[in-house]
Amino acid sequence: MLDNKTIEIIKSTVPVLQQHGETITGRFYDRMFQDHPELLNIFNQTNQKKKTQRTALANAVIAAAANIDQLGNIIPVVKQIGHKHRSIGIKPEHYPIVGKYLLIAIKDVLGDAATPDIMQAWEKAYGVIADAFIGIEKDMYEQAEEQAGGWKEYKPFVIAKKERESKEITSFYLKPEDSKPLPEFQAGQYISIKVRIPDSEYTHIRQYSLSDMPGKDYYRISVKKDGVVSSYLHDGLQEGDSIEISAPAGDFVLDHASQKDLVLISAGVGITPMISMLKTSVSKQPERQILFIHAAKNSEYHALRHEVEEAAKHSAVKTAFVYREPTEEDRAGDLHFHEGQIDQQFLKELIANTDADYYICGSPSFITAMHKLVSELGSAPESIHYELFGPQLSLAQSV
């Protein structure tokens, strides 16, 4: 527990953190990676170059400072980050390193304004925050390892099949090398993949949503070719090759306890966790009404459409596809789609009962737009769930 003086000092630093947060986190990463380059095997180097990771960390530090007297308020965020940490292999011994360089960065950027009292308060506060993460992540590691079929950290899998789904997206069917049964996962969860790319100094870790329902003898991911690792998966790995993956993680999951109508809204590769949710809901809650809305450029970029149409044979499932640039073949054929963008009128015509559970996945700008539209329908905030691919930025910062 922190004393009142420490809490008061930490809260007093919130305005300066809001002003200099990204400068501090940028300095933090630069200094830490300079002295500990081995950590580049864990952290996403692309996010470092795009500076999205420093923004996410700055948001987290500011939130922790603002809620330092009521850390329970940010436990959901801690758990969300904890899932990612467990998935990529963050360990307790990493936290003292992070704390050391965070304090160095605060002092470097704030200079004389970072008084001894402020630095001492932040050292104490970081210890409390780190303990919260370590405790939550310890439980997550134990659950991942001790569940039926579970394992610790990374395990070798074989690419049993590659299947092209669209112009940009290919599915990879992954089976464990030891042929042991796979642990169950919750629809909407992801796995981390660790690969060693030729001529790259460090290993690369990326997260991909599981795109099929639980209960299979494989895990499936459906990957858009858009970056160093995804391009390597598309072009550098073939059926029969081996990759390492961590056990499923993530809290963007389907709530089977709810009996409300289910509205799934996605765009592009954001369809991947939605396919898992759709199939799982049809299997486990066959009476639950489902509306599946997906936006794509056109049919050439629309992955997994046939699987959605197969699920839509179930009487409880309705679908709506939106193409912003349909091809002439799309217009001339018998495909059913709405041309343009998802807007308020479009949603009003589709969603008769707004008292539903909403799940949204896609680019940050898409999620922000859909969250706004769904909120304007009168939907309760706690009924709107979303998954941002990449560092966990706040919704307000995602565009």
UniProtKB/Swiss-Prot annotation:
Disulfide bond annotation, renumbered to this chain: none
Region ranges (Reductase): 149-399
Binding site for heme b: 85
Domain of life: Bacteria
Annotated NADP(+) binding sites: 268-273
Domain FAD-binding FR-type, first and last residues per copy: 152-255
This protein's GO CC annotations: cytoplasm
Residues involved in FAD binding: 190, 206-209, 388-391
One Pfam family in the UniProt entry: NAD_binding_1
Gene Ontology molecular functions: FAD binding; heme binding; metal ion binding; nitric oxide dioxygenase NAD(P)H activity; oxygen binding; oxygen carrier activity
Site residues, Influences the redox potential of the prosthetic heme and FAD groups: 84, 387
Expression induction or repression: By nitric oxide, nitrite, and under oxygen-limited conditions.
Active site per UniProt: 95, 137
Residues flagged as site, Involved in heme-bound ligand stabilization and O-O bond activation: 29
EC identifiers of the protein: 1.14.12.17
Gene Ontology biological process terms from the UniProt entry: cellular response to nitrosative stress; nitric oxide catabolic process; response to toxic substance
CDD domains cross-referenced by the UniProt entry: flavohem_like_fad_nad_binding, Yhb1-globin-like
Cofactor binding note of this UniProt entry: Binds 1 heme b (iron(II)-protoporphyrin IX) group per subunit.
Record keyword NAD present: yes
Domain Globin: 1-138
Catalytic activity, reaction form: 2 nitric oxide + NADPH + 2 O2 = 2 nitrate + NADP(+) + H(+); 2 nitric oxide + NADH + 2 O2 = 2 nitrate + NAD(+) + H(+)
Record's keyword annotation contains Glycosyltransferase: no
Cofactors demanded by this protein: heme b; FAD
Protein task: Is involved in NO detoxification in an aerobic process, termed nitric oxide dioxygenase (NOD) reaction that utilizes O(2) and NAD(P)H to convert NO to nitrate, which protects the bacterium from various noxious nitrogen compounds. Therefore, plays a central role in the inducible response to nitrosative stress.
Entry's free-text remark on domains: Consists of two distinct domains; an N-terminal heme-containing oxygen-binding domain and a C-terminal reductase domain with binding sites for FAD and NAD(P)H.
Record-given protein name: Flavohemoprotein
